[in-house]
A protein has these predicted regions:
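Domain-level signal for Mg2+-assisted phosphodiester chemistry and nucleotide/NA-binding surfaces
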Residues: 9-109
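Extended two-metal-dependent nuclease catalytic cores across DNA- and RNA-processing enzymes
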Residues: 9-13, 43-45, 71, 94-266, ...
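Positively charged N-terminal leader segments that act as targeting/secretion signals
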Residues: 5-7
Length: 274
């Protein structure tokens, strides 16, 4: 699925905030500064140079700022230790049992002192960025995660900046529902990848009916389809109850569809996700 490359460069970004997925940056920088010390016998110790790890993170953040001009304000987003998706599907990201690299938490704590940082309990950084971007439009999401293609607006993936329309974002959500995400631990429809999902939707239209039919054709159920759709969904401002401080689980109407030139319509516990 193609997304339009942004041509609104430098001057057009004046006054925008850069919403940065900092989980990725901190993990990468801390891992790169780890050192293994072998004392022989059964003792091997992994150490890290905190100062170098922190400087590495700052260098990465400065690179991003320079990409858009130093006038850009940055906000760093991190994932909460709790995750609402585990209540939907306990095995969600269950295979990610590798410990964080040395210094990971300490670097984050230092960043909280030096930068504006946002973490929402129960949410991943992706969700918090999605909520912020759809509440305060006109900013740039900075993330290599393909999930962020669901969120309308500008997305910089560390290679290029693309403009994502509401329709394109809604279509990508349905594609991910069918194709699943092995990295996150939900399978979608067996044997259906992104290319095949696009082919199915090109023939049947981007509808909830097409999603359900594809799941049923493989011996699965509509409940399976809804579970995958909720796991795949990156939250927007309309998917979050700010008073209760909890997600509003995505619930499509039977005739949900995404039409070019119109907004997708869904019913989410009585709230429209337009």
């Amino acid at each position: 699925m193609a997304f339009k490359k942004s041509t609104n460069w430098i001057g057009g970004f004046l006054g925008m905030k850069l919403l940065i997925d900092c989980d990725y940056i901190v993990y990468k920088c801390c891992a790169s500064t780890e050192t293994e010390m072998d004392f022989g016998e059964d003792v091997i110790v992994v150490t890290s140079d905190f100062s170098e790890a922190y400087k590495s993170v700052q260098r990465e953040l400065n690179k991003v700022k320079k990409e858009f001009g130093d006038f850009s304000e940055i906000i760093l987003f991190f994932t909460s230790p709790n995750n609402f998706r585990k209540k939907i599907f306990p095995e969600y990201k269950g295979h990610r049992n590798r410990k964080k690299p040395c210094g990971f938490k300490r670097v984050i704590n230092k960043l909280k002192e030096d930068y504006k940082v946002i973490v929402r309990d129960g949410l991943e950084a992706d969700d918090t960025m999605g909520i912020y971007q759809t509440k305060y439009e006109g900013n740039v999401i900075v993330s290599p995660d393909k999930d962020m293609r669901q969120i309308a607006g500008k997305l910089y993936d560390f290679k290029e900046t693309v403009d994502i329309t509401p329709d394109a974002g809604a279509r990508w959500h349905l594609i991910q529902t069918l194709s699943g995400d092995n990295t996150d631990g939900y399978s979608g429809v067996p044997g259906v990848g992104v290319k095949k999902a696009e082919k199915i939707f090109s023939e049947k239209g981007y509808t909830w009916k097409a999603v359900v039919e594809t799941f049923i054709d493989k011996g699965l159920t509509e409940e399976d389809a809804l579970c995958n759709a909720r796991l795949a969904r990156i939250l927007t401002v309309n998917d979050y109850d700010s008073k209760k401080k909890e997600p509003i689980l995505w619930t499509p109407s039977a005739n949900y569809r995404v039409d070019s030139g119109t907004e997708a319509e869904a019913q989410t516990d009585g709230a429209s996700t337009k």
